[in-house]
Each structure stands twice: as C-alpha cells, then as structure tokens.
C-alpha cells in the first residue's frame, strides 16, 4: 500500500458513522454504563438481533442448555408454561430431547479467526491501548495530539510486527486515503459490509472510540482525538500489509437450528417469573390500605435500583417510615465537579444531555473542617506521588524495593488476612478527618440554574411519584458502592448517574427543595409543602448498606428527627446486610454488618456484592403495590400514583426514561450471562487493566465490553443471575399505557420486538385486573387472574 486512492469518496466518514450504529457504545471503566451490547439492533425483533449478533460478534444469544435444565429442575420454569410456549411454536418433542438437541448444537461452535486476522487484531489492539491510555503508562505514545492515524503512521516503521513498512511513505498519508485505497478494489455495494465487518472485529475498542468521539466533554478526546475513520484507516492498512482477508465470508452460516426451541424455553422461564411476581402484586393491590391518614416520621426516596428494594423493606420495618423509588439522578441533568478536582463527571443517564455543572464549593463558616481535610489528604497525595516516582524511576526502583519490601509485605499480609481490621482502621480515620460534604455545598450556578428550572425539577419529582403529603423529614437517597482493588467498581455505582455515585444529585435536589422561593412557587402550582418539612440528601452504600445523611444544614428543630432516623437506619442496615449475606458465598448472615464491611475492604474479594445481578422486573406504581412483599432484590421500583396523573403525562416520562434505562441494564446482565466471553469480560483472574479505560483478557486483545464473570456467576458453571428479559408491571389504565406506546415508537419497538420480555398492566380502573401485552397495541387478560372471579374483557386499543 504505497499510494492514495485514485477515487475520492467525500461521504466516507458519514458512511462509517452510519454503519457504526450497529456497534454498541462502550464507556470507560471509571464511568461504566450498563448498556445493551446489541442496542444497535433494538429496531429488530429479538431473535433476529441475536442472530445478527452471532454473525458479527460471534456471541451466543440464548442461555446454554445446562442453564435451562437447572432452572427447569429447580422449578423456576413451570411445566405448563413450557408446554404452552412449545405448542405455540409447533414444537412437539419432549423437554429432555430438546435439551439434548441444544447441547449437541452448542458443541459445533467455532469462532477462531484465521492467523492473519488474529495478527491484525493483536497489532491494532496494542497501538489502540497505547494511544487511548489515560495516564497509566509512564511513557506515553508520541505524537498523540496529531490524531490516531498520524501517530500510528509515525511509529509503524519501528514496529517489527508490521512487515513491509520501512518508511512512513509506505502507507497513505491520511486515514481517509487508507480506507479508500482498500475499498476501491471492491464494488461500492460491498463497502458497507466490509466496513461493518472490520468495525465488528474489535467491538470493544470500536464501541469505546464511538462513545469517546461523541462525548464533547471528554478532555482526553479534546487533547488526543480519535475517530472511527482513523481506526479503520489503521486497521485496513494492517490488513493489507499482513495479507489478511478484507471482505467477510459470503457463505453465511445457516445459524442455530435450535433457536426456536431456545426462544420457547426462555419465554417459558419469563412467563413463570411473571406469574410469581403477579401473585405478590395482585395480593397487595387488593389487601393493602393506601395509608392510614397519619403523617410518617420520614419519607425516604431511593433510586429505583434493585438493591434499594432490600434496604427499603428493612427501613419500613423500623417504624412509621415511607420509602419511594425515583430515578437515581433525581431528575437533575448535570455534571459533577467534586471538591479539589478540575474534572467533571456525568451524573445523569447516557440518554439525557447534561445541562448544568454542579461544583462542590467550601462554605466560609466551615473553614476549620476544610483545613483539616486538606492537611490529611495533602499528606496522603504527596506520599502516593513520592512512592510512585520511586517505583517507576529506573535508577531508584531496585533500591526502593530492597528497602521497602518488608513494609509492603506486612501491609499486604494485613490487607489479605485481616480485611475487617483494615476497614475499621479506615473508618476510624474517616471519623477524625472531615469529609468534603461536611464543609462543602453544591453550587447551582455553573452554568446558572434558573429559578424556573429549580421549580421544574422539584415539581417533576413530586408529580412522577404522585406525592400529595409530606413528612417533617424528606430524605433523597442516592447510592454508591465501596470495594477494593476492583476495576469494575463503577459498575456497582448508580447507573442513572452514568456509573458514578448518586449522592451529589441527592444533595442538589434537597438544596433546591429547601429553597423558600422554590417552595412558594410549588405551592402556587398545587404542591403544598408544609412549613416544617426539611429536605436532606443522603447516600446508600450498597456494599455495606450503610446510609450516610448529609445533614449539616438541618435546623435544630429537626435534630431529634434526624437522630431517630439515624438509629433506625442502623437497625435496617443490620437486617439488610444479614439478608444479603445469605447470597454471598462463604458469608455468615449472623454477622452481616461485619461480613459486608470485610468484603468491601478485601482486595482479594472477587464478589464484594452482587450489584444488580438477579434483576428481572420493573414495577411502576404506588408502594402499596408491593408493600410487605419480599421481591428478593430483583425488582426496579418506581413510585407512581395513577390518581394524580389522569392523562398519563407522568407515566409517559417514566416509560420514556427509566423504562428504557432498566431495559439497557437488564440486557447487559442478560447477554453478559449467556455469553460472558463475547458480551462480558471473562474472569477477573485473567483480566488486565489497560490505560485506565478498561480491561483485556491476558496480555492484549479487544477491550472487553461488559461485566466480569464473577459479577454474574456463583462459580464458573452456575449463574447467580437468572438470564431473563425484563418484565414490566405498570399500575395504570390500559388506555393510558396504550396511548403512550402508540405515541412513542421507540418504546413500542422495545416491547413489540421482545427487548422488554413482558409487559403487564394492573388496571385500577377495572378492579386491578391484570392484562398482558401481546403486541400490536393489543392486550389479553393475564393468565394469573383468579379463575373463580369474573373475567374482565381485554380493552380494545383506543383510536
């Protein structure tokens, strides 16, 4: 490859971007977003999309036969449901024969690329890791400010893995020229398939480049830009130099003949789960009261995250407390700038554009706490920088190891053998060193948040949750996670905050709602907040179930309320930690608090918590819908009251936002479980972090796209997460839900195409009768309805 293409195709960049829509975005590990890896195919039926995923990425789309077998033998797949789903597809063989057929089909899988293509992948991955490094490498790749293609072109002659490139003149001068040089040897009708083939060859790196190029706030992209055209330019140049195949094979695989069988088993499993869920929902709708007229001691608003379901139950058991569910970014589209940082992080879902930069700024009357905080953290930071310089300095490294080896060895032994002691030591230090939230408050005017916007954010929150009454204390509770030596720690943070802690958002909404001018305007709009209601921000540590109250500005009149709540939260923590310990391998439920604290500090712990593993449903409705039910931490819960939303406007926002996000989360867990090698990231044991952006398996290769094996499996062969598509249950009229689906085609496609596995409406206008969505805006009575009661005809879709 020595010359530019003679044919200039001006639209090549846009053509590449269009084809790249089929590759899902991949976010950096420090801001991990649990997204659907097949999001580019959501416009297609699920079964077609997974077939495309297998063709492009080599990923399995359905659970293995042994997973189905275990679920069936454990009673999680109902025999009647399985029989119904098989008959619906005209499959007449018995379940055992079908399981054996699936097992046989699985042994035929062969995904190894040819040697030349493997060499291209290896060399390209090496240079992508070097170029995209975000501060991990002590010696960075030169010329990165010129762009990826130019930087690679400058070093390619010195790479012994790249034959036939002795001088920069041996390759085209531009990425576009490199792409066109290769493509011009093929008819234009084949260009898209060739582009698609090479973008899909390393979907992790491609997805990361795609995400980074789209992020206008990314400082690394601003400093060291990279585009998909540059990626393809380098790849196709390597393909040419290494004599690898350019075009994909034309003899497409016929696919898995057992696909219909797998779809039947999966649907039966999902139907069985839905029936079990509706038993709890139906009982609670008919038997629970909607309040007793007494004002609660406090109202706590949690993220809809499945981990909130457990702690909410235990808080409600402690006294007259109400808990509610709301999107964990609390409706504030923002980026957050932490104290002492000059970098902002996204704190809203990827589908929402940030509109504000909220900075933590110190208060003048807390100068003493700020000084103490800065003194301690300054010493720690200086020590870390000093040790890092010693370890990376070619001259000082060996004497440093000789002199400090015993001290490091002792520290390693302590962290390995006594993680609980390390956690207690850290907690003791934290108690004596002020945290930034003790002397900082969120600044709402960078760029300025208008008064109207503040009122809108507060009003939207209360309208979506259907609030008409307020306690003396209202606590907005974001969530975070605490783990040690865990590259995937951000996957345990708040998904609604783009893989970051939700505490800053909770503090912002609390500050907004405490604004007297905001309260006055809310009252004029019908949101009657009592004069004695105080709003507080808080943060739930999902690893230890500890809840931190940001109560520094609470007036003295409410100190007793806060003290009582804090005691109740400690009791709830003990109960929740004990319950969650039952699912943690080797943990003692009788020592739940110490067990969870130990796991948080244990740097050898591969499963500090289960995160959202087990998620299976999204329930939209009042707390009474699921009160007193143990949903086993498997349900996203969003508060909603149909009586305050006659036109369905609030429900529309919930279905457009949280429903879409929970579907993303659910499908990330689903696909990473059914094929962890392709859609997950494999075992943590063999992972290596690369460039502070992600992990690779072994010493190189593609950037892994999803969750690690240990986040999903109890062991290598036994999944903890049950791979089911999302079941959505909505407490509203069928007419309102139907109108929303009709109005918003992208939401309807998620349901019609099977990305949301089941949608059931519990209709309060029809005595809480349940109706299942069957596609095409049509409904039928749920099979779960009591056969002895009078059946309610499925309502026709409104015109």
UniProtKB/Swiss-Prot annotation:
Q: Its principal location?
A: membrane
Membrane-related topology note: Peripheral membrane protein
Name the needed cofactors. Answer: Zn(2+)
Localization per Swiss-Prot or TrEMBL: Cell membrane
Keywords, alphabetical: Cell membrane, Membrane, Metal-binding, Transport, Zinc
Matches recorded under InterPro entries: DabA
Question: Which GO terms fall under molecular function for this chain's record?
Answer: zinc ion binding
Recorded GO CC terms: plasma membrane
Signal peptide residue numbers: none
Q: Where do the record's region annotations for Disordered lie?
A: 574-598
> Which parts of the sequence bind Zn(2+)?
303, 305, 479, 494
Membrane-spanning ranges:
none
Per the record's keyword annotation, is Ribonucleoprotein included, yes or no?
A: no
Q: Decide whether keyword Membrane is in the record.
A: yes
Role summary: Part of an energy-coupled inorganic carbon pump.
Protein family: Belongs to the inorganic carbon transporter (TC 9.A.2) DabA family.
Report the HAMAP family cross-referenced here. DabA (MF_01871)
Q: How does it assemble?
A: Forms a complex with DabB.
**Official protein name in the record:** Probable inorganic carbon transporter subunit DabA
